[in-house]
Every structure is written in C-alpha cells, then in structure tokens.
Amino acid sequence: YEDFNVDLRSFLEAYLDGNLELLPEESFVPLGIRLKLYIKYDLNDDLSQVSQVIMNLDPADDNIILSFEYLVEYNELSQLKADYLDAADKFENKPKLYLKDKHGDYFGRILKKSILFDDESQFIDLQKERINLKDIVSIQFISAKRSVTNKQNDKTLSNQTSTLYKQADESEEQIEASDEFKKELRKTDEVLGGIYQKMFDGVIQKVNKFGGLSPSETDIRVASTLQHRELLEGNTTVMYAHRDHELPEHYNGLGYMNLISMIFEIEMLMSRLRRSLSEKPAAVNVLFIEEPEAHTHPQMQYVFINNIKELLKENQKREDGLFIELQSIITTHSSHIVAESDFDDIKFLKKCSVSHRVVAKNLKELASRYQSQDAKEDEILRSRYKFLKQYLTLNRAELFFADKAIFIEGDTERIVLPAMMKKIDMEDPSQKELPLLSQNISIVEVGAHSQIFEKLIEFLGIKSLVITDIDSYKEVQDDDNPNQINRVKCKPSDPAASHTSNNSLDFYFGTKDLDFYKNLEFDNKSLNKSEKDNTWKQDDSGFLKVVYQTEEQGYFARSYEDAFFSINKPLLELGHDAFPSLTKKWLNKYLDGNIDAYKFAENGVGSKPSLAIEILLNSKPDAGGNEFSNWQVPLYIKEGLLWLRN
C-alpha cells in the first residue's frame, strides 16, 4: 500500500468512504501500479537471452517492452468496498487501515508481461510461460541510506571486505590467491589440531571411559577446520594509515568512509553483474547509485564523479574477456557532481506542486531549442547554447536544483541581494509564505543578457525574476556630422529621453520605446511563453517577472546605483571614510545637493563591488534587532522579491 501514489490512495479511501462512485464497468480502467521497461536492440546485439520476449520479428520493430502490473479489476474493487463496510468497525472506520491490511486480497499477483509495441492486448505472460527475468535484466543499486557511521563499534568497511572475498570472480589471479590462502590454512589446521588435542585431553579421556566393549565408538579428536570464506567474516579490520601509524576505520571522516564504502560496494555489485565464468551475464545490466555526495565535501565529490566512469568501465570486463553492457544511473542533489558531469548525460526531474507528478527532461533536448531554420539566427542560438553549457557547468549548476531563480546584472546585486532578501523578510513578514532566505532560490549573474537564459527558464519551468536596468537614452544629432544620430545616456525623466538600450527588455517585451516601460504597471511585467509563436507575452499569472527602475520619491533612476543613492542619502552621510569606493569630491557634491543621484552614480563610483560590501559593513540594526535598518531597498527590487516570495 505504501507504494501506491497519492492520487490512487486518495481515490481508494474516498471510494470506501462513499465520497466517490466508480465509472460504469464498460468505462472502467483497472487501478494500481504499472511499470514499463523499454528495451531497444539492433542486429549487433546477442539476442539469445531475449529471444523469448521478442514480440515482433519485423526488422523495423526493434523494441522489447516488459510490463509489470499490480492492478484491481472492477468486480474486485466492488467486493473490496462491500467487505470494508462489513468490517469497518474493526478498523476504526478508517479506509486507510483496511487497505493497508487487506489490499493484497483484491489486487492479486503482480502480472509480468512482454507486450507488443503498438498493441498492448498482444502479450506474453512471463510467469505462465516460465520465462526467467534473471537472464534478461539484472538491476543492482547502492542506496542513499548507507550504513556508514564513525561509531567505535561500526565496522562497515571491514565487513565489506569479507563480502568482497565471498563474491570475488573466479579469475586466475583470484584463484591463485585463494589457493595460497587455503594452503596456509591447512598448515594452520595441523598446528591447531595438536593444540586442541592438549586443550580437550581431559574431557576426551572422560568420554573414552564410556566406550565399553567398543572403545573406538568414543575415541574422538578435536580437529581444526578453518573455512577460508568464513574466516574473513568478523576477522578482518580495515585500517587507514596516518603518518607511521594505523588507525581504525571509525577514526576516519564520514566522507572518506562513505567514498571507500561505495567503491567496495561497486566492486561487489559489479561482481554480481559479471557473474561467475560458468554463467552468462544478463542481457541488460543496470546499476543505480543514489546520492553519492553524502557526508562528502565538494572536492571529494569532484574526485568521485571524475573517476566513477573509469571505475565502472574497468569492472565491465571479465577474466574470460567478456565485456558486459552496463547502464549506470547516478541520482544527486549536488551541484558539484552536476558541474563535473557531461551536460548531455544529465536528466532533470521536477515534481509539480499542483499535480504531484514528476516530469523528467533530458538536458540534451535543450539543444534543439537553440536552433533555427534561419542560418544567421541559428549561428547566434548555437553560440548561446555553447555559452550556456559552459556557464552552467562551471558556475551555476545549482540552478538545476532551485525552485526559483533570480537573474541579476552583476557583482553589486549579487553581494547585496541576500541582505535585501533578509531585510524584506524582517520588515514585511508573511504568515502564508516561507521567508525568501528559507526558499530554494538560485541567484545567477547574467549582465544585461538574461535573454540567453530564456529557453532554459522555459525548459526548467521555475518561477524566475529578472532584475535589470532601464538604461534610458536620448537621440542627439552629431555636432560634426548632421546626418549622424548619437545615443546619449540620460535620466528617464529627461524630456528628450526616448528609448532603452537594454537588450533584455527589448527581447522580452518587444519594444525599445521608453514611455512603454515608464508607464508599465507592475502586474503587466509578468510573462509567459506563447506556444503559438514561441515568444514571451505579458500575462499577469506568468512565471517570469522582469523588473527595472521605477519612479520613487519623485526621482526616476536609470541604474541600480542611482536608485540606491536617491533613497539612502542619510547612509551616505557617514562620509568618505565609510565609503572609500566613492570619489570624495563627487560624494561631497551629492551630499551638499549640488548634483543629483544620476550624476553622482555616473561619476562618483570607483568600484561597484566594493560599494556593495561597504553598504553591508555600514549597516546597523534597529532597537528591535532588525538588521540593515539604516538603508532602504529600491522599490523595483522590493516589489520583485515580494512577488517571488509568494
């Protein structure tokens, strides 16, 4: 029952409670658990082990589909309800308790079938035909719940060595070593036999007195019979060397113990997959390794993923030269392991919070989205995809594990944004939503090029916030060439300001017109991807929000810096000693009111990352303990973060 999915459990419990009725029998589809294993083959494969489950001899059909079903039919489901109603009192009138205890009486046995690719009504019953799956599929796995601890009485690694010996291949090298081991044991048996005879002599003499007329009946010996396989069990200890000393395994860190244990376990499982020299390996061999990153630091995770393929490859070859085909699957929540993996090998799995279904996607499918029929556009898209692969694997692999994402322009926002998130959570707490810093949010620096990531945003389907600049400019006739029009940066409030130079804004909203952005309401800054023409469209329920500077306290900023300066003049009054990244001359002019925030931001900032750090260094808590109380978050960023928090 615990294997039933949430929807099936809910349906069965509601049905037994009388809150749901079944469809008519002719429309009813059996309920339960279904698993289908799809196997592809070609003419180069050895089909001897799968010949019994091949359903179609047509060369065009190269599929084997193994189906496993645990289902309840209409009549059995009706009987289930009737029986529950009769016995409900014994189960506290709780359908869940009855189903846990009795479901097996109605679902019956697990059906194992080989079905036709395009017609499931055509199948071979594997149990009825007595077809053994052992020769077709062999699946081994290393669970995430490993028994590695560093308690003194734990001997996980030591116990694994005895198991390794028991499962070792019958290779010439192994046989030779085993024979040498047995030879030494026989010598030891002779020595121990003499010692045992002396140890047990007293009791043996007493036994002999009961021999009567046939002394030979009670003439016993105590012999040593050391068994080479059993001897290792409980009698081997893995030690690790530290300088000139050997220390017990539990003295080592959990990370190293976990890594060594996995290597031991891989050796054991691969031995099972290879099988003995007298047996043929299964046609399909699958090895699952769950969350190898447990207890390990990033560098160790890099070492693991960089070496695991070679380790598995070495273990695929048997002593007789047979090379087993192996598919290995590693599940992970580690961005470090993903960063060191081949991009095309990665599968992305995401659970939908509404339907509770898990959607699986291959990252190599993303490449097809960065292609076009137009040659020029195709070249641009392919270069973007190449950059995206490099950037994600080298810098931001954690994006694959995020529930939400923020795309920012640069270092300034990256440094100060977590503080802004914490400040918003403290000043504007929500009873319904988790604080921003408690949510799984990834922050990605993209400059003014968030459009490069738009197909990835769509592919991942995660709620995303783009924080960018309005980058306003005006068109001015060139003094020397009247036919040339120059773009000149200016405040958005400049009467001559007409356009934005921000490529991201132009890409998402399809216009450079400045008035469009100045008048755009916050709700209209949300976007969804249109399936019709594959472009982003305004949608107040969209999962992508693009925010930029807006008018605040009578001032319309062009960039993050002048937006911050315009509302945080009291903080800057701490002076040049507190903000050495700001040019003293321009800082004094701004504090004296001789220039506005725009001119100060354009001329007075020496280092933007240093400025962000200085903002944090000069932050003060208020009397209530709320941090960062002596400065304010620009409105456009605050609105965006509050939207993302919901």
Language-model segments: which ranges?
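Switch/communication elements of ASCE P-loop NTPase nucleotide-binding domains
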Residues: Y1, E233, M239-L394, D425, ...
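Glycine-rich phosphate-binding loops of NTPases
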Residues: D3, D7-G32, K36-A168, I175-D179, ...
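Short alpha-helical segments and helix-capping/turn motifs at coil-helix boundaries
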Residues: Y15-L23, Q49-I54, I115-E129, R221-S224, ...
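Conserved nucleotide-binding/hydrolysis micro-motifs of P-loop NTPases
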Residues: Y41-N44, V72-E76, R146-T149, E293, ...
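Short helix/loop capping segments that flank catalytic or ligand/cofactor-binding pockets
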Residues: D45-S48, N150-N153, E249-H250, M257-I260, ...
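The start of beta-strands in P-loop NTPase/AAA+ ATPase cores
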Residues: S138, N285-V286, K404, S464
